Amino acid sequence: MIQKNWQELIKPNKVEFSSSSRTRATLVAEPLERGFGLTLGNALRRVLLSSLRGAAVTAVQIDGVLHEFSSIPGVREDVTDIVLNIKEIAIKMDGDDAKRMVVRKQGPGVVTAGDIQTVGDIEILNPEHVICTLDEGAEIRMEFTVNNGKGYVPAERNRAEDAPIGLIPVDSLYSPVKKVSYKVENTREGQVLDYDKLNMTIETDGSITGEDAVAFAARILQDQLGVFVNFDEPQKETEEEAVTELAFNPALLKKVDELELSVRSANCLKNDNIVYIGDLIQKTEAEMLRTPNFGRKSLNEIKEVLASMGLHLGMEVPAWPPENIEDLAKRYEDQY
């Protein structure tokens, strides 16, 4: 069946987010197939940094200023430095239409992003950010154009042909995600020791949480990769077909290598061709002790594990083993 190509790959049973602040979050996802930590980590990182939409200033008009190479009496920074500071204003804005916001202040003092008068659904996320410094008697008025977009747009592309004199275009840094780093470690699942564990740290401007950013990036990848799927999804079995009455506890379909036994005990079971718990519980204590290298310590370990599942050695299991045991194990894996 073609669906086994993707259905039989292990998927993370642990996806955890933790946030140390409004702008920083950490993701841990495990276990992943070997190599998938790097594959998914790199893909998510690229999309997070390049493809999520956010808001940014696209242009500014400063009273009395005709171009960005000017200086303003009583203002310590020149216009070029002011424009650079404006680029760093973090903004959250809903909607796709361009909006305007204004700041007007007299000196002496510092003009910060928190001094900006916003309208509608615009929110300044770093109000402490310094835009410029005014001396005694100085005054400044600036009007900003704000828009939504994605990625990085240079000032030249924000320069409208019919723009009035004095409207200075600004480089727009739309991405709400500022930094992404990840590392891949080994992790264990059952007796398999070389699965991948993905650790990712996401830093945003505060307009979006790290968890939502990852969710949006994953959805973008899902949507983009979907165009390469050139077949219809195989039909799922009907409920009537899917439900098979078992004559035994579904837990017996679990493989013994998932019991996290000691290496010695696990190797003894493997050498005795005991694959499933259903194989194991039909053995008596005497039969187990006749297994090469299997001692009383291993026996007690296995009895303790089985007891925690409500099972014991020497049980009788009707209709065991079933013919389609692998398919049944897949079907009932969420029940043990």
UniProtKB/Swiss-Prot annotation:
Catalytic reaction list: RNA(n) + a ribonucleoside 5'-triphosphate = RNA(n+1) + diphosphate
UniProt GO cellular component terms: cytoplasm; DNA-directed RNA polymerase complex
Spans annotated as Alpha N-terminal domain (alpha-NTD): 1-232
Keywords: DNA-directed RNA polymerase, Nucleotidyltransferase, Transcription, Transferase
HAMAP family assigned: RNApol_bact_RpoA (MF_00059)
Subunit structure of this chain's protein: Homodimer. The RNAP catalytic core consists of 2 alpha, 1 beta, 1 beta' and 1 omega subunit. When a sigma factor is associated with the core the holoenzyme is formed, which can initiate transcription.
Name of this protein: DNA-directed RNA polymerase subunit alpha
Organism in which the protein naturally occurs: Rhizobium leguminosarum bv. trifolii (strain WSM2304)
